[in-house]
Amino acid sequence: RAGLKFPVGRVHRLLR
């Protein structure tokens, strides 16, 4: 869960 370090929205889609 790298939402705090990465821009929540780009990584959120990849992690999800």
Curated annotation (Swiss-Prot):
**Major subcellular location class:** secreted
Q: Which GO terms describe its molecular function?
A: protein heterodimerization activity
Supply the InterPro entries for this chain: Histone-fold (IPR009072), Histone_H2A_CS (IPR032458)
The reply on keyword Secreted is: yes
Q: Where in the cell is it found?
A: Secreted
- Keywords from the UniProt entry: Amphibian defense peptide, Antibiotic, Antimicrobial, Secreted
Chain's role:
Has antibacterial activity against E.coli HP101BA (MIC=9.6 uM), K.pneumoniae PTCC1388 (MIC=10.6 uM), M.luteus PTCC1625 (MIC=6.0 uM) and S.aureus PTCC1431 (MIC=8.1 uM). Has no or very limited (<3%) hemolytic activity at concentrations of 15 ug/ml and 60 ug/ml, respectively.
The family note in this entry says: Belongs to the histone H2A family.
Quote the protein name from its UniProt record: Buforin-EC
Question: What is the protein's species of origin?
Answer: Euphlyctis cyanophlyctis
UniProt lineage: Eukaryota, Metazoa, Chordata, Craniata, Vertebrata
